[in-house]
UniProtKB/Swiss-Prot annotation:
It comes from Simian immunodeficiency virus (isolate PBj14/BCL-3) (SIV-sm). This is Protein Vpr. One of its GO terms (biological process) is symbiont entry into host cell. InterPro entries: RetroV_VpR/X. The keyword Repressor does not apply. The modification Phosphoserine is found at S80. Its main location: virion. Residues 80-101 are annotated as: Disordered. Interacts with human UNG. Keywords: Activator, AIDS, Cell cycle, Host nucleus, Host-virus interaction, Phosphoprotein, Transcription, Transcription regulation, Viral penetration into host nucleus, Virion, Virus entry into host cell. The keyword DNA-binding does not apply.
Length: 101
């Protein structure tokens, strides 16, 4: 019996550039809910000046927006339940462990 590589039974992926554009649109929509649109426009212009209309520029913009949103949520976004007492911590109903360690 001869060895054969496994057949690709996974669903076809969409092309990389379409995926990057979709992710960028989603993260831009989320960023608009949390940051001043003028700031986002300035950031977009800066990235465009450095990279033009390229996938590399889109990737850099995604990375910057992901980091900014992460720091924003971690600092206590008022639109998020993460990191703020006003939104409530979903894990606060779990009693603390006693004498486990």
């Amino acid at each position: 019996m001869t060895e054969r590589p496994p057949e690709d039974e996974a669903p076809q992926r969409e092309p990389w550039d379409e995926w990057v554009v979709e992710v960028l649109e989603e993260i831009k929509e989320e960023a608009l809910n949390h940051f001043d649109p003028r700031l986002l426009t300035a950031l977009g212009n800066y990235i465009y000046d450095r990279h033009g209309d390229t996938l590399e520029g889109a990737g850099e913009l995604i990375r910057i927006l992901q980091r900014a949103l992460f720091i924003h949520f971690r600092g206590g976004c008022r639109h998020s339940r993460i990191g703020q007492s006003g939104g409530g911590n979903p894990l606060s109903t779990i009693p603390p462990s006693r004498g486990v360690l």
